[in-house]
A protein has these predicted regions:
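Secretory-pathway ectodomains
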Residues: 1-241
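Compositionally biased, intrinsically disordered or flexible polar/acidic segments
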Residues: 231-408
Length: 408
């Protein structure tokens, strides 16, 4: 039976301090969710000690100081809960820890909002700018700016993760330059309540007193998952200058962007999952058939399952502009996600006007359906435009993604 926090994890003592928990990294999956322990939306930040969350919910049914709305509700007594299960501890448990906690807030006036020192406004904080990063598409240094929608919490930089309320709870993994990940459904607090500690990303229930109609009034904890786990981000709508692209992935039919730890930023095309870099793509026909399936349907293959699971069908020609002229490695990602069997789909593909795949049957090459397949080629791109042509001889053309990496 586990006692205490996960080995190698970090504790969080509050006050918006850095908490560089290396166990908390993109992608993240849900470990548990529950609605037993709830907090008023403007309660102070919890602390995390030895795998236990120490929180002080506000007593939002108590009377406030009349004619002075800057003084908020008093605090209840500390509540202790296990971060790995969500279980609220009994008053008889962890007596040593309870005895060390200061009894604050019951008789002292509390401020209405709790924010990190860098946040200067209570409402509608500006879009965060958190240091600099290397743009994975261009290789250039730029300000680390990422999408934020509405919410009183402007975010906190915990060192490796930046977390914020962006409509729902959200986070950005700085170790990866992930883009913004929206934890859709639950509402996080007006105080920042999305905290990496104990090897988890902790998102306690900070919804009480809010009139917004969020669909999931719950708390949850998230744990790091393998790279095969499906999770999507929104990178932001950066403009793309001519001849600037050095590396890029195009994920046809995907519901969002995704950055890999080997360095490729995969963009959903068409862009549907939030703002993405403004790449210039031309297709013929202009509206081929895009399809998405969840990656859990995929078998183990050569491609990441979240790339292979989505496709474009019926594509005849594709042009991607604004590449930096030079020699490129071009990886074509495929998976037979329809019910076409062996011999029921065949296509010939030209890259920069030269045939690279002839009579290509995805099902036969992958030894089955729902299995990712990659074919890699090198080509010279002199005019800054990638050109791919597809001709189906049986059925319709099908491809999942394209990855381009400029050679040194």
């Amino acid at each position: 039976r586990r006692v205490g926090a996960l080995p190698g994890s970090a504790q969080y003592e509050g006050n918006y301090a850095r908490c560089e928990d290396t166990l908390v990294r993109f992608p993240l999956g849900v470990l548990w969710f529950d609605d037993t322990l709830s907090h008023f939306k403007r309660s102070p930040q919890p602390e995390f000690v030895d795998g236990i969350m120490v929180s002080r919910p506000k007593d939002w049914q108590a009377e406030r100081v009349k004619d002075n709305w800057s003084i908020d509700y008093p605090l209840r007594r500390p509540v202790l809960s296990d971060i790995y299960t969500g279980r609220v501890l009994l008053p008889t448990e962890q007596s040593s820890l309870r005895n060390r906690l200061p009894d604050i807030g019951r008789d002292e006036p509390q401020q209405s909002y709790y924010h990190a020192p860098h946040q200067k406004t209570m409402l509608n904080p500006p879009t965060p700018v958190v240091g600099t990063r290397i743009n994975p598409i261009t290789g250039l240094k730029e300000p680390r700016v990422f999408p934020k929608t509405y919410g009183c919490d402007g975010g906190v930089d915990y060192g490796l993760l930046y977390t914020l309320r962006s409509g729902t709870a959200a986070f950005y993994d700085k170790s990866l330059e992930s883009g913004t990940v929206f934890i859709s459904g639950p509402r996080s607090g007006c105080s920042n309540s999305i905290i990496p500690s104990g090897g988890l990303l902790n998102v306690p229930y900070f919804y009480e007193g809010c009139t917004c109609s969020y669909p999931l009034p719950i708390g949850l904890s998230m744990v790091a998952m393998p790279e095969t786990h499906e999770q999507w981000t929104s990178w932001g709508d950066d403009p793309v200058k001519p001849n600037s692209i050095l590396r890029i992935g195009i994920n046809f039919g995907a519901p969002g962007d995704r950055k890999t730890r080997d360095g490729t930023l995969w963009l959903d095309y068409p862009s549907v999952g939030g703002p993405s870099p403004q790449i210039r793509v031309e297709t013929s026909p202009t509206t081929p058939t895009f399809r998405y399936r969840h990656s859990l349907w995929m078998n183990k293959g050569q491609s990441q399952p979240w790339i292979g699971a989505s496709t474009v069908e019926g594509l005849q020609e594709l042009k991607l502009h604004d590449l930096n002229p030079g020699r490129y490695s071009v990886r074509l990602h495929f998976a037979e996600t329809d019910d076409a069997g062996k011999g029921e789909r065949s296509q010939t593909i030209h890259l920069q006007g030269k045939p690279v795949l002839s009579g290509f049957d995805i099902h036969s090459a992958a030894n089955g359906s729902m299995t990712g397949l990659v074919r890699e080629f090198e080509t010279e791109i002199d005019d800054g435009t990638l050109k791919l042509n597809f001709k189906a001889t049986v059925g319709r053309s099908l491809i999942s993604g394209i990855e381009l990496i400029r050679k040194p």
